[in-house]
Curated annotation (Swiss-Prot):
Location of the PDZ domain: 1-84
Highest rank taxon of the organism: Eukaryota
UniProt source species: Homo sapiens (Human)
The entry's keywords: Cytoplasm, Cytoskeleton, LIM domain, Metal-binding, Nucleus, Phosphoprotein, Zinc
Effect of residue 313 to S: Abolishes ability to suppress anchorage independent growth but not cell adhesion to collagen
Residue ranges of every copy of the LIM zinc-binding domain listed in the record: 284-344
The UniProt record lists the keyword Cytoplasm: yes
Protein name listed in UniProt: PDZ and LIM domain protein 2
Family annotation (Gene3D superfamilies): 2.30.42.10, Cysteine Rich Protein
Protein backbone atom coordinates (compact mmCIF):
# COMPACT_ATOMS: atom_id res chain seq x y z
CA UNK A 1 0.00 0.00 0.00
CA UNK A 2 1.53 3.32 -1.14
CA UNK A 3 1.16 6.34 1.12
CA UNK A 4 2.87 9.65 1.87
CA UNK A 5 3.98 10.69 5.36
CA UNK A 6 5.02 14.21 6.40
CA UNK A 7 7.24 14.24 9.50
CA UNK A 8 7.29 17.60 11.27
CA UNK A 9 10.78 18.91 11.98
CA UNK A 10 13.32 19.86 12.83
CA UNK A 11 15.71 16.87 13.02
CA UNK A 12 16.22 14.44 14.67
CA UNK A 13 13.23 12.66 13.23
CA UNK A 14 13.08 9.69 15.62
CA UNK A 15 13.48 6.63 13.37
CA UNK A 16 16.19 4.38 11.92
CA UNK A 17 16.61 2.90 8.47
CA UNK A 18 18.47 -0.03 6.91
CA UNK A 19 19.26 -1.26 3.41
CA UNK A 20 20.32 0.58 0.28
CA UNK A 21 21.94 -0.09 -3.06
CA UNK A 22 25.16 -1.22 -1.39
CA UNK A 23 23.17 -3.77 0.67
CA UNK A 24 21.11 -4.95 -2.34
CA UNK A 25 17.93 -4.34 -0.31
CA UNK A 26 15.37 -1.51 -0.36
CA UNK A 27 15.62 1.23 2.24
CA UNK A 28 13.34 0.21 5.12
CA UNK A 29 12.37 1.66 8.49
CA UNK A 30 13.67 -0.63 11.26
CA UNK A 31 12.90 1.30 14.46
CA UNK A 32 10.60 4.14 15.45
CA UNK A 33 11.27 5.94 18.73
CA UNK A 34 8.44 6.12 21.23
CA UNK A 35 6.90 9.61 21.62
CA UNK A 36 8.98 10.83 18.66
CA UNK A 37 8.15 12.88 15.61
CA UNK A 38 8.09 9.86 13.32
CA UNK A 39 5.72 8.10 15.72
CA UNK A 40 3.37 11.09 15.62
CA UNK A 41 3.41 10.97 11.82
CA UNK A 42 2.34 7.26 11.89
CA UNK A 43 5.68 5.94 10.59
CA UNK A 44 5.98 2.22 11.37
CA UNK A 45 8.79 -0.38 11.39
CA UNK A 46 8.77 -2.33 8.14
CA UNK A 47 7.75 0.61 5.93
CA UNK A 48 9.76 0.69 2.69
CA UNK A 49 10.89 4.21 1.73
CA UNK A 50 10.22 4.76 -1.98
CA UNK A 51 11.11 8.47 -2.19
CA UNK A 52 12.63 11.14 0.08
CA UNK A 53 11.26 14.66 -0.51
CA UNK A 54 10.18 13.64 -4.01
CA UNK A 55 13.55 12.07 -4.96
CA UNK A 56 13.49 8.35 -5.71
CA UNK A 57 15.35 6.26 -3.12
CA UNK A 58 15.65 3.15 -5.30
CA UNK A 59 19.26 3.79 -6.37
CA UNK A 60 20.49 5.50 -3.19
CA UNK A 61 23.28 4.17 -1.04
CA UNK A 62 22.64 3.69 2.66
CA UNK A 63 24.85 6.62 3.68
CA UNK A 64 23.32 8.82 0.96
CA UNK A 65 19.79 8.16 2.21
CA UNK A 66 20.85 8.86 5.80
CA UNK A 67 22.43 12.17 4.75
CA UNK A 68 19.34 13.31 2.83
CA UNK A 69 17.06 12.48 5.78
CA UNK A 70 19.26 14.24 8.35
CA UNK A 71 19.72 17.39 6.22
CA UNK A 72 16.10 17.55 5.10
CA UNK A 73 14.16 20.74 5.87
CA UNK A 74 10.88 20.59 7.76
CA UNK A 75 8.65 18.82 7.02
CA UNK A 76 10.30 15.58 5.86
CA UNK A 77 8.13 14.04 3.16
CA UNK A 78 8.47 10.29 2.71
CA UNK A 79 6.69 8.15 0.14
CA UNK A 80 6.24 4.70 1.66
CA UNK A 81 5.23 1.22 0.57
CA UNK A 82 3.52 -0.37 3.57
CA UNK A 83 2.93 -4.12 3.53
CA UNK A 84 -0.50 -5.47 4.43
CA UNK A 85 1.00 -8.26 6.60
CA UNK A 86 0.73 -7.56 10.29
CA UNK A 87 4.06 -7.55 12.09
CA UNK A 88 4.30 -9.01 15.64
CA UNK A 89 3.03 -6.57 18.18
CA UNK A 90 1.00 -4.52 15.63
CA UNK A 91 -2.63 -4.88 14.49
CA UNK A 92 -2.71 -2.35 11.59
CA UNK A 93 -5.67 -0.63 13.18
CA UNK A 94 -7.65 -3.79 13.99
CA UNK A 95 -8.20 -3.12 17.66
CA UNK A 96 -11.33 -5.24 17.97
CA UNK A 97 -10.86 -8.33 20.12
CA UNK A 98 -13.35 -10.29 17.99
CA UNK A 99 -11.29 -9.70 14.84
CA UNK A 100 -8.07 -10.75 16.59
CA UNK A 101 -9.71 -13.87 18.02
CA UNK A 102 -11.04 -14.83 14.58
CA UNK A 103 -7.54 -14.49 13.07
CA UNK A 104 -6.01 -16.57 15.85
CA UNK A 105 -8.58 -19.35 15.44
CA UNK A 106 -7.98 -19.38 11.70
CA UNK A 107 -4.23 -19.77 12.16
CA UNK A 108 -4.77 -22.60 14.66
CA UNK A 109 -7.15 -24.35 12.26
CA UNK A 110 -4.59 -24.06 9.45
CA UNK A 111 -1.89 -25.57 11.67
CA UNK A 112 -4.19 -28.46 12.68
CA UNK A 113 -5.03 -29.23 9.05
CA UNK A 114 -1.35 -29.25 8.08
CA UNK A 115 -0.56 -31.68 10.90
CA UNK A 116 -3.41 -33.97 9.84
CA UNK A 117 -2.18 -34.05 6.25
CA UNK A 118 1.33 -34.82 7.49
CA UNK A 119 0.11 -37.77 9.57
CA UNK A 120 -1.94 -39.13 6.67
CA UNK A 121 1.08 -39.03 4.36
CA UNK A 122 3.02 -41.22 6.84
CA UNK A 123 0.19 -43.61 7.73
CA UNK A 124 2.06 -46.67 6.38
CA UNK A 125 3.87 -48.67 9.10
CA UNK A 126 6.84 -49.27 6.81
CA UNK A 127 7.34 -45.57 6.25
CA UNK A 128 7.24 -44.80 9.96
CA UNK A 129 9.62 -47.56 11.06
CA UNK A 130 13.29 -46.61 10.76
CA UNK A 131 15.66 -48.76 8.80
CA UNK A 132 17.85 -51.34 10.51
CA UNK A 133 21.13 -49.90 11.70
CA UNK A 134 19.89 -46.30 11.85
CA UNK A 135 20.57 -44.37 15.08
CA UNK A 136 16.81 -43.88 15.63
CA UNK A 137 15.88 -47.55 15.51
CA UNK A 138 14.40 -48.76 18.85
CA UNK A 139 16.24 -51.56 20.66
CA UNK A 140 14.46 -54.93 20.30
CA UNK A 141 13.21 -56.91 23.26
CA UNK A 142 15.47 -59.33 25.13
CA UNK A 143 13.55 -62.35 23.78
CA UNK A 144 14.26 -61.43 20.13
CA UNK A 145 18.02 -60.92 20.62
CA UNK A 146 19.09 -64.41 19.56
CA UNK A 147 20.84 -64.13 16.19
CA UNK A 148 22.02 -60.55 15.74
CA UNK A 149 23.71 -58.35 18.32
CA UNK A 150 21.92 -55.18 19.45
CA UNK A 151 23.03 -52.02 21.22
CA UNK A 152 21.01 -49.69 23.37
CA UNK A 153 20.72 -45.98 22.64
CA UNK A 154 22.51 -45.06 25.85
CA UNK A 155 25.53 -47.17 24.91
CA UNK A 156 25.51 -45.67 21.40
CA UNK A 157 25.91 -42.22 22.92
CA UNK A 158 28.72 -43.60 25.12
CA UNK A 159 30.52 -45.21 22.18
CA UNK A 160 30.12 -42.21 19.87
CA UNK A 161 31.25 -39.57 22.36
CA UNK A 162 34.83 -38.42 21.57
CA UNK A 163 35.99 -38.05 25.16
CA UNK A 164 34.29 -41.15 26.63
CA UNK A 165 33.66 -39.50 30.03
CA UNK A 166 31.84 -42.55 31.35
CA UNK A 167 34.87 -44.76 30.75
CA UNK A 168 36.50 -43.33 33.87
CA UNK A 169 33.91 -45.10 36.01
CA UNK A 170 34.42 -48.59 34.54
CA UNK A 171 35.84 -51.24 36.86
CA UNK A 172 36.57 -54.80 35.77
CA UNK A 173 35.86 -57.86 37.88
CA UNK A 174 36.62 -61.50 37.23
CA UNK A 175 33.90 -63.79 35.93
CA UNK A 176 33.99 -67.32 34.43
CA UNK A 177 34.31 -67.08 30.67
CA UNK A 178 34.09 -63.28 30.48
CA UNK A 179 35.09 -60.03 32.10
CA UNK A 180 32.46 -57.62 33.33
CA UNK A 181 32.78 -53.84 33.52
CA UNK A 182 30.28 -52.24 35.88
CA UNK A 183 29.51 -48.55 35.80
CA UNK A 184 30.04 -46.63 39.03
CA UNK A 185 26.51 -45.25 39.34
CA UNK A 186 23.61 -47.45 40.27
CA UNK A 187 21.11 -48.09 37.49
CA UNK A 188 23.58 -47.89 34.59
CA UNK A 189 23.91 -50.82 32.21
CA UNK A 190 26.92 -53.08 32.65
CA UNK A 191 29.33 -53.90 29.83
CA UNK A 192 30.44 -57.50 29.34
CA UNK A 193 33.56 -58.44 27.37
CA UNK A 194 33.37 -61.86 25.74
CA UNK A 195 36.46 -63.94 24.87
CA UNK A 196 37.18 -64.30 21.15
CA UNK A 197 35.09 -66.98 19.48
CA UNK A 198 36.10 -69.02 16.40
CA UNK A 199 32.93 -68.08 14.52
CA UNK A 200 32.32 -64.90 12.50
CA UNK A 201 32.23 -61.77 14.62
CA UNK A 202 29.81 -58.92 14.46
CA UNK A 203 31.08 -55.35 14.47
CA UNK A 204 28.34 -54.30 16.92
CA UNK A 205 28.16 -55.26 20.62
CA UNK A 206 25.40 -57.65 21.70
CA UNK A 207 23.07 -57.87 24.68
CA UNK A 208 23.48 -60.34 27.54
CA UNK A 209 20.57 -62.59 28.46
CA UNK A 210 20.72 -61.40 32.08
CA UNK A 211 19.12 -58.14 30.96
CA UNK A 212 20.56 -54.67 30.49
CA UNK A 213 24.15 -55.86 29.91
CA UNK A 214 26.17 -55.18 26.79
CA UNK A 215 28.68 -57.60 25.28
CA UNK A 216 31.89 -56.12 23.86
CA UNK A 217 34.41 -57.89 21.67
CA UNK A 218 38.01 -57.58 22.83
CA UNK A 219 39.06 -56.51 19.32
CA UNK A 220 36.46 -53.75 19.09
CA UNK A 221 37.52 -50.11 18.97
CA UNK A 222 35.43 -49.21 22.03
CA UNK A 223 37.10 -51.85 24.19
CA UNK A 224 40.57 -50.73 23.04
CA UNK A 225 39.75 -47.12 23.94
CA UNK A 226 38.56 -48.19 27.38
CA UNK A 227 41.77 -50.15 27.93
CA UNK A 228 43.95 -47.21 26.83
CA UNK A 229 42.14 -44.89 29.24
CA UNK A 230 42.71 -47.32 32.10
CA UNK A 231 46.40 -47.78 31.27
CA UNK A 232 46.93 -44.03 30.89
CA UNK A 233 45.81 -43.42 34.48
CA UNK A 234 48.72 -45.32 36.08
CA UNK A 235 50.02 -44.04 39.40
CA UNK A 236 52.94 -41.55 39.11
CA UNK A 237 56.35 -43.04 39.86
CA UNK A 238 58.76 -41.50 42.33
CA UNK A 239 61.99 -40.15 40.85
CA UNK A 240 65.24 -41.90 41.76
CA UNK A 241 66.86 -38.68 43.01
CA UNK A 242 64.03 -37.97 45.43
CA UNK A 243 64.06 -41.58 46.61
CA UNK A 244 67.82 -41.43 47.33
CA UNK A 245 67.38 -38.15 49.20
CA UNK A 246 64.57 -39.61 51.28
CA UNK A 247 66.64 -42.68 52.15
CA UNK A 248 69.62 -40.50 53.13
CA UNK A 249 67.51 -38.33 55.42
CA UNK A 250 65.89 -41.36 57.06
CA UNK A 251 69.30 -42.98 57.60
CA UNK A 252 70.64 -39.76 59.13
CA UNK A 253 67.68 -39.57 61.53
CA UNK A 254 68.24 -43.18 62.62
CA UNK A 255 71.93 -42.47 63.22
CA UNK A 256 73.09 -45.05 60.71
CA UNK A 257 75.24 -44.75 57.62
CA UNK A 258 73.42 -42.56 55.11
CA UNK A 259 73.22 -43.59 51.50
CA UNK A 260 75.41 -41.83 48.95
CA UNK A 261 73.71 -38.95 47.18
CA UNK A 262 75.58 -37.60 44.13
CA UNK A 263 75.93 -33.85 43.83
CA UNK A 264 76.97 -31.52 41.02
CA UNK A 265 79.86 -30.14 43.14
CA UNK A 266 80.92 -33.37 44.79
CA UNK A 267 83.72 -35.46 43.20
CA UNK A 268 82.45 -38.27 41.02
CA UNK A 269 83.24 -41.77 42.13
CA UNK A 270 85.55 -43.75 39.87
CA UNK A 271 84.16 -47.09 41.04
CA UNK A 272 82.17 -49.25 38.65
CA UNK A 273 78.43 -48.74 38.62
CA UNK A 274 77.70 -52.14 40.16
CA UNK A 275 80.18 -51.59 43.03
CA UNK A 276 79.02 -48.01 43.63
CA UNK A 277 75.44 -49.17 43.98
CA UNK A 278 76.42 -52.04 46.23
CA UNK A 279 78.57 -50.00 48.68
CA UNK A 280 77.71 -46.30 48.39
CA UNK A 281 80.24 -43.94 50.02
CA UNK A 282 79.37 -41.60 52.87
CA UNK A 283 77.97 -38.12 52.46
CA UNK A 284 80.27 -35.14 52.74
CA UNK A 285 80.49 -33.47 56.15
CA UNK A 286 80.43 -29.70 56.50
CA UNK A 287 83.63 -28.54 58.25
CA UNK A 288 81.84 -25.55 59.81
CA UNK A 289 78.66 -27.05 61.29
CA UNK A 290 79.89 -30.69 61.34
CA UNK A 291 76.69 -32.08 59.79
CA UNK A 292 76.19 -34.21 56.70
CA UNK A 293 75.57 -32.45 53.41
CA UNK A 294 72.56 -34.17 51.87
CA UNK A 295 72.16 -32.10 48.71
CA UNK A 296 74.58 -29.48 47.34
CA UNK A 297 78.13 -29.18 48.67
CA UNK A 298 80.78 -26.47 48.14
CA UNK A 299 84.27 -27.94 47.72
CA UNK A 300 86.86 -25.65 49.32
CA UNK A 301 89.89 -27.92 49.20
CA UNK A 302 90.52 -31.61 48.78
CA UNK A 303 88.47 -33.33 51.46
CA UNK A 304 87.01 -30.05 52.80
CA UNK A 305 83.37 -29.23 52.06
CA UNK A 306 80.72 -26.83 53.34
CA UNK A 307 77.03 -26.18 52.95
CA UNK A 308 76.22 -23.29 50.60
CA UNK A 309 74.85 -21.44 53.64
CA UNK A 310 78.05 -22.08 55.64
CA UNK A 311 80.34 -20.79 52.88
CA UNK A 312 80.55 -17.28 54.40
CA UNK A 313 83.11 -14.73 55.55
CA UNK A 314 84.30 -15.38 59.11
CA UNK A 315 84.12 -11.63 59.92
CA UNK A 316 80.99 -10.17 58.28
CA UNK A 317 79.08 -13.37 57.37
CA UNK A 318 78.85 -12.43 53.67
CA UNK A 319 78.12 -15.42 51.42
CA UNK A 320 81.16 -16.16 49.27
CA UNK A 321 79.50 -18.38 46.69
CA UNK A 322 79.61 -15.82 43.86
CA UNK A 323 82.66 -13.85 45.15
CA UNK A 324 85.37 -16.33 46.09
CA UNK A 325 87.26 -16.50 49.37
CA UNK A 326 90.64 -15.51 50.84
CA UNK A 327 92.56 -17.59 53.37
CA UNK A 328 93.88 -15.82 56.47
CA UNK A 329 95.35 -18.52 58.61
CA UNK A 330 92.72 -21.25 58.70
CA UNK A 331 89.72 -18.98 58.23
CA UNK A 332 87.85 -17.82 55.13
CA UNK A 333 87.30 -14.09 54.58
CA UNK A 334 85.97 -11.84 51.89
CA UNK A 335 88.40 -9.57 50.05
CA UNK A 336 87.62 -6.51 52.17
CA UNK A 337 88.27 -8.07 55.59
CA UNK A 338 91.20 -10.10 54.31
CA UNK A 339 92.96 -6.89 53.23
CA UNK A 340 92.27 -5.35 56.64
CA UNK A 341 94.17 -8.17 58.32
CA UNK A 342 97.10 -8.12 55.90
CA UNK A 343 98.33 -4.88 54.42
CA UNK A 344 100.53 -6.66 51.90
CA UNK A 345 98.37 -8.10 49.06
CA UNK A 346 101.10 -10.58 48.16
CA UNK A 347 100.45 -12.57 51.30
CA UNK A 348 96.84 -13.24 50.29
CA UNK A 349 95.91 -16.41 48.52
CA UNK A 350 92.65 -16.22 46.61
CA UNK A 351 90.33 -18.75 45.04
CA UNK A 352 87.76 -17.59 42.48
Amino acid sequence: MALTVDVAGPAPWGFRITGGRDFHTPIMVTKVAERGKAKDADLRPGDIIVAINGESAEGMLHAEAQSKIRQSPSPLRLQLDRSQATSPGQTNGDSSLEVLATRFQGSVRTYTESQSSLRSSYSSPTSLSPRAGSPFSPPPSSSSLTGEAAISRSFQSLACSPGLPAADRLSYSGRPGSRQAGLGRAGDSAVLVLPPSPGPRSSRPSMDSEGGSLLLDEDSEVFKMLQENREGRAAPRQSSSFRLLQEALEAEERGGTPAFLPSSLSPQSSLPASRALATPPKLHTCEKCSTSIANQAVRIQEGRYRHPGCYTCADCGLNLKMRGHFWVGDELYCEKHARQRYSAPATLSSRA
